[in-house]
Structure formats: structure tokens, C-alpha cells
């Protein structure tokens, strides 16, 4: 069931800067969505328009089928967890979480019960009387979430709310946020520039750049099938090579012809080819599909990050559980399904239509 719809949303500021360009998206109830992109991509502007903090220059915002474009933020069934959490330092945990209910003059017995339930949901039982200054960053974030969910919103917006935490806490809170969302069954819209966060938590990701949605889909679809150079580079590490389509399921790059899994592209058309570093296997030279010479390697704990130069001068990035010798010539092997072919300038709609066409011919 659709809960949020943005219909041809544009945002242009007084100085002429266009932050959003004809944004269209539909969000279903009870899912975890991420708006992913670099600084200035428009992701936070979308969040603020949904929340009612920023007015769109054009277009409509719908909530549960109702036009809320001009509805005051305080009247929307939407709450926000801000990047800095926006907790009141002079109030303790209980008072922070209870704040919205006290403003609405709810009975004290109801407030106590709801604060207890909210703190239990975020695993802060026994913290009600703690001062905010006594809490860790992760605990402060949980208080902010408890405060945001206490009045049972239908949608929770989270604006870069993991960015201030260290790596270990960020990982921990990824699991926490996903668990909270599933327990509550409400729609989460999470803004981030961190592709790992988006991939780990989301049901669906919207990748933004320059005020436009470049691609949307499940984490697996976006990682395995990027529609353009920007998405391929922004979502994970990639080897991106210039190539030429030979025919359906055959492509040329690095001076050789390879079997691939792509079709629906004109024979002879120039394309870009994506190979993920973790899909490349290091072999003996004779067993590889291409030969490369190792230039450097870094041990990153669970794998080696290896840079190597191909015979055509292309610099390859390879992730391997086995180390190699600097200067060593090795082979690299990959399967046809590991090769992803991108048409130059193809939109997401054109990519989807092509995919449906050749999959329908199987």
C-alpha cells in the first residue's frame, strides 16, 4: 500500500540553484527506504519536503492518498530523527522521550506507559532517569528514536543519523535500526551518503545525484545491475572499462571477446563494462582470461586489496583472500555473469525496458 508519493517535485532556490529536478517516487507502507547520494545530491531536500520543513517549487506531495503539499509539518503523521539528534540537554531521558506527549497534555499514566514501551523498543530499559550527558553517542541516538516513535508516526525520517558514530557503533546501529523498523512495521526513510549503510538496511534504495534519481531498486539489483557510470562507481568498488558489443551475450573489452549475460544492445555499439573486484579470481597466468602485473596490495583484514596493470595499461582492482607478490604476473578469471554491460547514457527506464524485452525472449 502506497503511503508517500512525490509527483513531479522540483525545488529551485531564490539564487537559481535547482536542488531537485522533477522527482517522482512512490513508497509503500512498512518498508525501509534509503535516499543515497553524495553531498548536494538532493537527498536531504527530499526528506525536508516530505516532513514539511521545506516547500517544493513545483509538484505535489501525497500521504496515504491525500495531498499534503501545503499541510503544516506539525499536522503530518511523520517524525524526524536529525543528524545531531536534537535532544534537550537540560532534560533527562524520560523527559526527552515524553516531551511530545506532554505538549499534547496526555494523561501522566499514558505518558509513563508509552515512555516505558518506547525505551524498551530501543533497548534502553532502566535509562529513564539518566542525564543526556551521561549517554554514549549510540545511546543518545536511541533516545532520539524513542522520542520520535512515541506518538506512533506512520513514517519516520532519519537524516544522516549514523554519521557521528564510530565504525563499530555504526555497524551495531544498522542492525538496531532495521530491527526497530521491522518490530514497529512503520515506514523508515533513511538519508545517507554511505553506500554500505544503504545496502545493509534497505528494502529499496534511491540513488541520487545532481537533484535527480539515477536509479532505484533493491540493494542487490542496484549493486549487481548499475544502470550508469555514476551508480557503478558510487555503489561499491568497480572496474569500469570501455568496450564494444559484438552481439547478444558477447562483448569485447581489454582487446578480447567475452561471453556475457547482456542483450538488447546494437552490435558494434560502444559500451562500458563493469567488473566488481570481488568477482575476479587470481589464477596462474595460463588459466586466466586476462594477464595482469601486480603493482601493490593492502591487507584489509578479511581480504587483500590488489592493484594490477593489464596488458592494455588498464589498472585493475582485485579483492582476494590470498596475497600475491609485487611485480608478479598473474591471470584473472571471471564468469560471464560477472560482466555487466552498460549502454552509454541509458536511463533507468530504458534499461528496465531492455531487460524486460530480452528476458521475455528466453
Curated annotation (Swiss-Prot):
Sample GO molecular function, one term: ABC-type putrescine transporter activity
EC number: 7.6.2.11
Family the UniProt entry places it in: Belongs to the ABC transporter superfamily. Spermidine/putrescine importer (TC 3.A.1.11.1) family.
Sites where the protein binds ATP: 37-44
InterPro entries: AAA+_ATPase, ABC_SmlMolc_Importer, ABC_transporter-like_ATP-bd, ABC_transporter-like_CS, Mo/tungstate-bd_C_term_dom, P-loop_NTPase, PotA-like, PotA_ATP-bd
Stated role: Part of the ABC transporter complex PotABCD involved in spermidine/putrescine import. Responsible for energy coupling to the transport system.
A single cellular component GO annotation: ATP-binding cassette (ABC) transporter complex
Location relative to the cell: Cell membrane
Name used for this protein in its record: Spermidine/putrescine import ATP-binding protein PotA
Main EC class the enzyme belongs to: translocase
